[in-house]
Swiss-Prot record:
This is HPr kinase/phosphorylase. Both phosphorylation and phosphorolysis are carried out by the same active site and suggest a common mechanism for both reactions. ATP binds at residues 170-177. Keywords: ATP-binding, Kinase, Magnesium, Metal-binding, Multifunctional enzyme, Nucleotide-binding, Serine/threonine-protein kinase, Transferase. It comes from Chlorobium chlorochromatii (strain CaD3). Its cofactor is Mg(2+).
């Protein structure tokens, strides 16, 4: 199966969205507003952050002003310890003339009220956090990495089977949702059905799957209708997100197609440029796809943690028997 490799990436987010969302998702950060400005007017265009040491000192030739500006102990103490108030105001005025998204003061640091007023006049939001610069940078970078990551929505079902993220794909009507439902009934977890949103952060080779926020954890079963999986099976049956580790493609049985029987020739596919193992499963009456998906997950775990592949073990055993019999035959002659 060929997947669309062209992901979608956000060009920017508003500072208002940044503040509201990160406040909900990252409780440790606990950002607080220092001034009141229209946060909708400011936008963040980059996932990287900036410590503006040289820019505060007046060197702005290479100033990456489109990034969120982090004021740690060094920056705040530099400004607070300038004896000449006029010089301090001049340097900060030179700083805020750029269209900066926002300023974040870490470690509960404070700026003189005159500098906060300058930022307010320039319509630059200023926030404060009790977190250290290291912790704040880690949390904010992780959040922005997620916001500016490449993503794409695919048709299929995403399930967590024995801790392995399995993406079920295939043409409509093959029973992907029914297989996912059966897996949930057997104690596994549903991540998404019908519309699976897959993200790739930066240059990472990890793909994270989530549900479509509109469809949520609703599932359509042909002949039955829409089922609320969370309401029916409880919180244990759903997962907020899961790494995509194996792709299982359900296919119509075709007598002219040669399907893999031994597993020596491992297939793979690519999603957003990341290579993933692919298992193609032909659909036949009486075939228990649910149990096969469980075995697919167990085989993945065996290979990852024990480097054990059943087909290779069987091939090695047969080769040893053949070589042994050949040696005995040559000895008899």
């Amino acid at each position: 199966m060929i997947f669309d490799q062209k992901g979608i990436r956000k060009r920017s987010i508003t500072v208002a969205y940044f503040y509201n969302t990160i406040s909900q998702k990252c409780c440790d950060l606990k950002l607080r507003r220092v001034n009141n400005v229209d946060e909708q007017k400011r936008r963040i265009y980059e996932r990287d952050l900036h410590r503006p040491g040289l820019a505060l000192a007046g060197f702005t030739n290479l100033f990456t002003y489109k990034r969120v500006q982090i004021f740690g102990n060094t920056e705040t103490r530099f400004l607070n310890h300038l004896d000449d108030e006029k010089e301090r105001n001049r340097l900060f005025e030179n700083f805020v003339r750029f269209k900066i998204p926002c300023i974040i003061l870490t470690s509960n640091n404070k700026l003189p009220e005159s500098l906060i007023e300058m930022a307010t006049r320039a319509e630059i939001p200023v926030y404060s956090t009790r977190c250290s610069s290291t912790k704040a940078i880690y949390n904010i970078t992780d959040f922005l990495d997620d916001q500016f990551s490449i993503y794409q929505q695919y048709h299929g079902s995403m399930v967590d089977v024995y801790g392995v993220g399995v993406l079920l794909v295939g043409k409509s009507g093959l029973g992907k949702s029914e297989v996912a439902l059966d897996l949930i009934e057997r104690g596994h977890g549903l991540v998404a059905d019908d519309a699976v949103v897959i993200r790739r952060k930066g240059e990472s080779t990890t793909l994270m799957a989530r549900r479509n926020n509109i469809i949520d954890h609703f599932m359509e079963i042909r002949g039955l209708g829409v089922v609320d999986m969370k309401a029916n099976f409880g919180i244990r049956a759903i997962r907020e997100q899961k790494e995509v580790q194996v792709v299982a493609e359900l296919m119509h049985w075709d007598s002219d197609t040669e399907y893999e029987r031994l597993g020596l020739d491992a297939k793979s596919t690519k999603i957003l440029g990341v290579e993933l193992p692919l298992v193609q499963l032909p659909i036949l009456p009486g075939k228990n796809i649910t149990v096969i998906i469980e075995v697919v997950a167990l085989n993945f775990l065996l290979k990852r943690y024990s480097n054990y592949v059943a087909a290779e073990a069987l091939h090695s055993r047969i080769s040893q028997v053949i070589n042994s019999e050949r040696t005995n035959f040559d000895g008899d002659e």
